[in-house]
Amino acid sequence: LRNAGTALGFALGQARALLGSGRPALIFVQLAHEANETGLIYGPGLAQFGIDPDAVTLVRAETVSDLLWAVEEAVVCTAVAGVVADVATPHKALDFTISRRLALRAEAAGTSAILVRYGLEREASAARYRWRVMPAASRPPPFDTRAPGLPRFLVTLEKGRLAGLAEGTSITIDWTKDNGFAVADPGRSADEDAAR
């Protein structure tokens, strides 16, 4: 769980891109006992990712079965842009069959389900994409080089093909408040990358 914040930040950045006037809601689902250990999402933090905290519904499920039921029901709601399910520990119920069912339901409804998992072991999944996400050192902001910069992620596409990225490709991406993710250019600041 060491990089839990990084994985969740990457998932929230993806979820932000899904939100729109026709689908203004985001559902965040977490096991209650895991939330006690890993923490909850934070309104001002959501705002930093361009997500209105009022657009997010937080679901704390008691069991994995309840969590999966909540995800499955939420993806078919016409107001929901996406569902982020944060699952910290391995569970037998999260197998290929359930991931396939969730993927098919989300695709049929025109929405997305983002399942955030932690750990180094791969698990069978019908997900279209699987990313391995690690933190990367951020660039300091230009006004104070000692201050932390905006989030930066080292991501590896483990499954799927996306915008010319082949499986196994790793890239560093910056988070920009206005434009979301941008591929990092080592010679520029995150704001300069976003302005290009």
Where are the regions a protein language model picked out?
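N-terminal regions of ATP-driven nucleic-acid and macromolecular assemblies
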Residues: 1-196
